[in-house]
From Swiss-Prot:
Keyword Transmembrane helix belongs to the record: no
Origin superkingdom: Bacteria
Keywords, in A-Z order: Amino-acid biosynthesis, Aromatic amino acid biosynthesis, Decarboxylase, Lyase, Tryptophan biosynthesis
One Gene Ontology biological process: L-tryptophan biosynthetic process
Signal peptide: none
Pathway assignment: Amino-acid biosynthesis; L-tryptophan biosynthesis; L-tryptophan from chorismate: step 4/5
Name this polypeptide is given: Indole-3-glycerol phosphate synthase
Gene from which the chain derives: trpC
Disulfide cross-links: none
Length: 295
């Protein structure tokens, strides 16, 4: 999947006239591209409020990050659970009206989740870094900042807001970007979950030899449709490679019942990221128990 960055000049001036016309490449081709293009604007706005230098100054006051990777690896529940806090999505709109992030985080911890993922994108998912900060005060579990990260600034902001891990999406980042952003996270002692959707993206990640936590996204980020067969296809071809190189595979999205979990367990998946399935339930703890007690 090729995701373009926004053209530097989104309009073209018409000769001898007092107006400009849109550049032919100035319109996003899909939802993911639209999200990524908006991130440039969002980051500029963040920097107007808090500079990168000021963010970095706040790092010394923080406690060391919790070990997200080890929490999944040594989870009592198999596969380990990254339980997600998400109010809305571009494809489904508002998922949870009664949205109380701190209460949700407490429910996840009581239920046995290994880690918690927090959506911080505001425009498309109605998340925020303030929500991440609130969740940090409500749980001792490692936290993943779930955003569309394209800049070092976002990593520092995530860390200052309480994140222990970040998500990097292969589809929106070049190899150089992936390597650079991973290095920053490593320097901050944060875990990195790198996300792929197909074999081509996975081959890129494996060639970098830098990632030990790989998320297989069952959701096509161009269409936002989910298909659990994505994980099955990738694991059928790469499970031996994952084992050989001590890579922990995570299956993300589209996991709806205990049969799905049994299938993923049987093919070597070590962790699952589940959000919408829990967000639609009035009783999250009971839903969690029903889902995992039968596997």
């Amino acid at each position: 999947m090729e995701i373009r960055r926004r053209p530097p000049n989104p309009t073209v001036r018409v000769e001898n006239l007092e107006y400009a016309v849109p550049h032919r490449e100035a319109k996003a081709k899909n939802i993911l591209e639209e999200i990524v293009w908006y991130k440039d604007t969002e980051i500029k706005n963040f920097k107007k409020i808090v500079s990168l230098e000021d963010l970095i100054k706040k790092l010394d006051k923080l406690s060391p990050p919790k070990d997200f990777f080890q929490s999944i690896l040594h989870s009592k529940i198999k596969p380990g659970v990254i339980a997600e806090i998400k109010k809305a999505s571009p494809s489904k709109g508002v998922i949870r009206e009664d949205f109380k992030p701190k209460e949700i985080a407490s429910c996840y911890e009581k239920s046995g989740a290994s880690c918690i993922s927090v959506l911080t994108d505001k425009r498309f998912f109605q998340g925020s870094y303030e929500i991440l900060q609130d969740v940090r005060t409500a749980t001792n579990l490692p936290l993943l900042c779930k955003d569309f990260i394209i800049s070092a600034y976002q990593i520092y902001k995530a860390r200052v807001s309480g994140a222990d891990a970040i998500l990097l999406i292969a589809a929106i980042l070049s190899d150089d970007d992936l390597f650079y952003l991973k290095k920053i996270a490593d320097n901050l002692k944060m875990s990195v979950l790198v996300e792929v959707h197909d074999g081509q993206e996975l081959e890129r990640i494996l060639s970098l030899k830098s990632f030990n936590l790989i998320g297989i996204n069952n959701r096509n980020l161009k269409t936002f449709k989910t298909d659990l067969k994505t994980s099955i296809r990738i694991m059928s071809k790469y499970s031996d490679i994952f084992s050989k190189h001590n890579i922990v595979p995570i299956s993300e999205s589209g996991i709806n019942n205990s049969d799905d979990l049994k299938t993923l367990n049987s093919i070597g998946i070590k962790g699952v990221l589940i959000g919408e399935r829990f967000m639609r339930e009035s009783d999250i703890e009971n839903s969690f128990k029903k889902l995992f007690n039968s596997i």
